[in-house]
């Protein structure tokens, strides 16, 4: 018996079926990523979701290590330039040097990139912000303050970055929402299915 002839439409349907099948394990649901204990503790104390705190830290201080994006505690942002240090001591020296040459409102430090100028009342010594536990406690506190009961946490996340809101807050929300989807193990895209729907007769 002769094999059935292949037509462009049958090839297209076959490719779409393969694409959909390949996308099901990862395109529909991702494995949930449980935030490390320090994030869970800080979030619990502040009364906020630990996934929200972890997603913010991934956005603020995330670096690639061993193929994974992880928050880095000894991170600074000085006048828009990210700086990473190998140790807390090195980061503290870098912070002190930056403070001598840069307005404090243009310096962010630690896991949650706490601003030295706008949040000066939240710490005693600037290098305290390089203590991961202290930094997370402050970040969680700020998120809690920016959240209105009953609203989506993404709105509070936007105000964490820019309390006045606007487009900078919206851009930040979009970036953090991708990290949040990864942490929560939720679907991030339906592109393969949509693409096949467009081509189906």
Placement of each model-derived feature along the sequence:
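Short, intrinsically disordered, low-complexity terminal/loop segments
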Residues: 1-4, 199-201
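Bacterial N-terminal signal peptides that target proteins for export
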Residues: 3-16
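Bacterial N-terminal signal peptides
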Residues: 14-25
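Sec/Tat signal peptide C-region and signal peptidase I cleavage site
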Residues: 27-31
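Catalytic glycan-binding domains that act on GlcNAc-containing polysaccharides
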Residues: 32-201
């Amino acid at each position: 018996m002769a094999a059935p002839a292949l037509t462009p439409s049958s090839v297209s349907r076959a490719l779409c079926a393969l694409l959909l099948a390949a996308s099901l394990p990862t395109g529909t649901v991702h494995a949930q990523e449980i935030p490390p204990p320090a994030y869970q503790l800080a979030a619990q104390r502040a009364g906020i979701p630990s996934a929200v705190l972890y997603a913010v830290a991934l956005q603020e201080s995330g670096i690639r290590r061993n193929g994974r994006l992880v928050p880095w505690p000894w991170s600074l942002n000085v006048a828009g330039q990210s700086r990473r240090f190998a140790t807390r001591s090195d980061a503290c020296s870098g912070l002190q040097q930056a403070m001598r040459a840069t307005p404090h409102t243009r310096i962010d430090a630690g896991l949650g990139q706490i601003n030295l100028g706008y949040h000066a009342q939240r710490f005693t010594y600037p290098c305290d912000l390089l203590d991961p536990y202290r930094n997370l406690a402050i970040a969680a506190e700020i998120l809690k303050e920016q959240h209105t009961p009953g609203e989506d946490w993404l709105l509070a996340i936007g105000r964490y970055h820019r309390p006045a809101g606007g487009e900078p807050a919206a851009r930040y929300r979009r970036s953090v929402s991708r990290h949040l989807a990864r942490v929560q193990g939720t679907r991030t895209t339906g592109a393969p299915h949509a693409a096949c729907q467009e081509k189906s007769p």
